[in-house]
């Protein structure tokens, strides 16, 4: 589904992501990483802290959760014309001595509130697997170590970063806001 240039919002807010998993804090980690990748695109985005503060005020004044408030009303409060919603749909962290898996799956969607239209919906996942069949006592120790290394916190950070990169690569950039690089006319060196 192609998105026309007129449909792409210019000022976008990334709302808190829903967590449909048992992993505490994963939605916030994915949202921050997603925002870091999204902020390099030529959209005008609202800082997450400002979005969060205004959402708290909006939820208090309406008595509803952010997911129950119409997108247009959210954008009026935030001063934007587009919203990005997100949901963590799966998270796995498995360690079984000879095998380990670390995985996350998320869904994001962009809404243009001026047109009252969902522009895109993306779902992607990243999984890291490690393991082997040990054939000697030494290889059993090495397999256990390598599978344990796969579920460290740094691996989780890499996995989340990779997921958010993949999602952001699929989001179109508005042409009118693409930053022009300066033309290099001359280079002087010593």
Give the ranges of each region predicted by the language model:
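C-terminal/domain-edge helix-coil "capping" segments
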Residues: 1-8, 74-77, 113-190
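N-terminal leader/capping segments at the start of a protein or of a new domain
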Residues: 1-21
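N-terminal segment of the mature soluble domain
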Residues: 9-11, 21-87, 113, 117-121, ...
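Surface-exposed, polar/charged interaction patches used for macromolecular assembly or partner binding
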Residues: 17-18, 64, 107, 121, ...
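Extracytoplasmic/secreted cell-surface and envelope-processing proteins
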Residues: 23, 93-97
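A generic structural micro-feature
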Residues: 78, 98-103
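Generic short beta-strand segments
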Residues: 87-92, 126
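A short beta-strand signature
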Residues: 102-112
């Amino acid at each position: 589904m192609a998105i026309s240039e007129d449909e792409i919002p210019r000022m976008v807010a990334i709302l808190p992501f829903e967590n449909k998993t048992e992993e505490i804090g994963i939605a916030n980690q994915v949202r921050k990483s997603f925002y870091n990748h999204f902020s390099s695109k030529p959209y005008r985005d609202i800082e997450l802290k400002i979005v969060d503060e205004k959402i708290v005020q909006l939820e208090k004044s309406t008595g509803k959760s952010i997911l129950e408030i119409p997108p247009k009303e959210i954008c009026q409060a935030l001063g934007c014309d587009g919203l990005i919603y997100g949901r963590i749909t799966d998270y796995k962290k498995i360690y079984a001595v000879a095998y380990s898996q670390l995985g996350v799956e998320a869904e994001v969607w962009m809404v243009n509130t001026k047109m009252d239209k969902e522009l895109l919906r993306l779902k992607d996942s990243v999984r890291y697997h490690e393991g082997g069949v040990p054939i000697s006592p030494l290889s059993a120790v090495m397999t256990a170590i390598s599978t344990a290394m796969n579920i460290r916190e740094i691996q989780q950070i890499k996995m989340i970063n990779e997921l958010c990169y993949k999602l952001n690569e699929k989001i179109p950039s508005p042409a009118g806001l693409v930053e022009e690089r300066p033309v290099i006319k001359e280079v002087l060196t010593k």
